[in-house]
């Protein structure tokens, strides 16, 4: 979990921006979206192979 302490004389917007950057860098939001719904192993394999196919195409 990301934690951000508001510094002295720092606006709330700046602290929020630092927090969002930390969350993005840690991959927390992406991981949460990925785990939001259960995905069967067969569907995971299919999605993984499609991503690899797209990556290989370029």
Curated annotation (Swiss-Prot):
InterPro entries attached here?
Ribosomal_bS21, Ribosomal_bS21_CS, Ribosomal_bS21_sf
**One MF annotation (Gene Ontology) recorded for this entry:** structural constituent of ribosome
Output compositional bias ranges, type Basic residues: 43-58
**PROSITE patterns, alphabetized:** RIBOSOMAL_S21 (PS01181)
Q: Which GO terms describe its cellular component?
A: ribonucleoprotein complex; ribosome
Which chain regions cross the lipid bilayer? none
- Location of region: Disordered: 39-58
The record's annotation in Gene3D superfamilies points to: Ribosomal protein S8 (1.20.5.1150)
- Swiss-Prot/TrEMBL GO biological process terms: translation
One of the Pfam families matching this protein, by short name: Ribosomal_S21
Instruction: Supply the alphabetized keyword list.
Output: Ribonucleoprotein, Ribosomal protein
Q: Which family does it belong to?
A: Belongs to the bacterial ribosomal protein bS21 family.
User: What's the protein here called?
Assistant: Small ribosomal subunit protein bS21
The organism's taxonomic lineage, starting at the top: Bacteria, Bacillati, Bacillota, Bacilli, Lactobacillales
